């Protein structure tokens, strides 16, 4: 029988058990996310989307106000905060007590979300690279912190990404980040390999092929491949056509040790988790 490190994160003073994979539902309060179906701008849109995420079984809502798609428009911290306030006020009004993560690379934005709205997790696509104050802020706030690997920035990350040794470079990146965070006293660190961020389609599949090797860190692993170009560039079509491919890769990710799936399509992901867990539990007998 396969043994696996039991992983927990401290969420608002309660332990979230990751021995059963969790689903994180995406709430984009942006006008320019790469997947048009995920853009929520009006109050009614946000209310409907947050209700859908919860009703379909996600345990975390990931709210983001800064589009990280390739060549995304850069917005000011003030505009990012304005968009987030709108979404967080609605979440707290209609779904108090639900677990919320904020997708931001800015320390001041993270502080506002945690201190003013009770956000439980910080999800940083830049792992501190785009704001030198972020690591210190995370240590001060004492919340779980998701660090993602990205080569470059959202504005330039897909301009001919290159690696001499993809896996070695990604692992070294995480090793250095984790050590710095540990030195600052950060306890709950979650790794995100960063599919689609500064990587070609081939890079993404190489990374997926070695996903189980991230278990060496003995840290929770988040995978976000929902409707990304690594799917529709291979199969043809657009993000609208990429749900089946997403489900296939989510399944592979779970079999290779993913603890959290970050997705647009919550119901499909929850069902995927349920089936994979059933298979794993049946194999134990």
Task: Spell out what each predicted region is.
Residues 194:
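Conserved Motif II region of HX4D acyltransferases
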Residues 25-28, 124:
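Redox-cofactor binding/interface segments in oxidoreductases and associated redox assembly factors
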Residues 1-19:
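N-terminal carbohydrate-binding accessory modules
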Residues 31-33:
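Enzymes and membrane/adaptor proteins characterized by extended Gly/Ser/Thr/Asp/Glu-rich
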Residues 11-12, 18, 35-52, 68-93, ...:
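Active-site-adjacent loop and "lid" segments of alpha/beta metabolic enzymes
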Residues 18-26, 54-64:
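N-terminal glycine-rich anion-binding loops that anchor highly charged ligand groups
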């Amino acid at each position: 029988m396969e043994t696996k490190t039991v992983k927990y994160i401290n969420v608002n003073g309660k332990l979230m058990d990751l021995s059963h994979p969790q689903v994180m539902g995406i709430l984009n309060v942006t006008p320019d996310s790469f997947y048009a179906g995920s853009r929520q701008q009006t109050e009614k849109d946000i209310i409907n989307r947050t209700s859908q995420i919860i009703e379909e079984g996600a345990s975390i809502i990931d709210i983001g106000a800064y589009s990280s798609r390739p060549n995304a428009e850069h917005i000011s911290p003030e505009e990012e905060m304005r968009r987030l306030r709108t979404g967080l006020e609605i979440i707290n009004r209609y779904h108090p007590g639900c677990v919320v993560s904020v997708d931001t690379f800015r320390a001041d934005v993270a502080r506002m979300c945690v201190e003013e709205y009770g956000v439980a997790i910080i999800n940083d696509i830049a792992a501190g690279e785009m704001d030198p104050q972020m690591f210190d802020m995370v240590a001060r706030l004492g919340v779980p912190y998701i660090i993602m690997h990205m080569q470059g920035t959202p504005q330039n990350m897909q301009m001919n990404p290159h690696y001499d040794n993809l896996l070695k470079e990604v692992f070294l990146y995480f090793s250095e980040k984790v050590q710095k965070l540990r030195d600052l006293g950060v306890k709950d660190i979650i790794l995100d390999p960063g599919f689609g961020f500064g990587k070609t389609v081939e890079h993404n599949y190489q990374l997926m092929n070695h996903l189980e090797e991230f278990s060496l860190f003995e840290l929770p692993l988040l995978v976000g491949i929902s409707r990304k170009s690594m799917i529709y560039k291979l199969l043809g079509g657009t993000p609208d056509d990429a749900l089946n491919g997403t489900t296939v890769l989510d399944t592979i990710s779970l079999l290779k040790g993913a603890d959290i799936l970050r997705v647009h399509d919550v119901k499909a992901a929850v069902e995927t988790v349920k089936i994979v867990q059933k298979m794993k539990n049946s194999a134990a007998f």
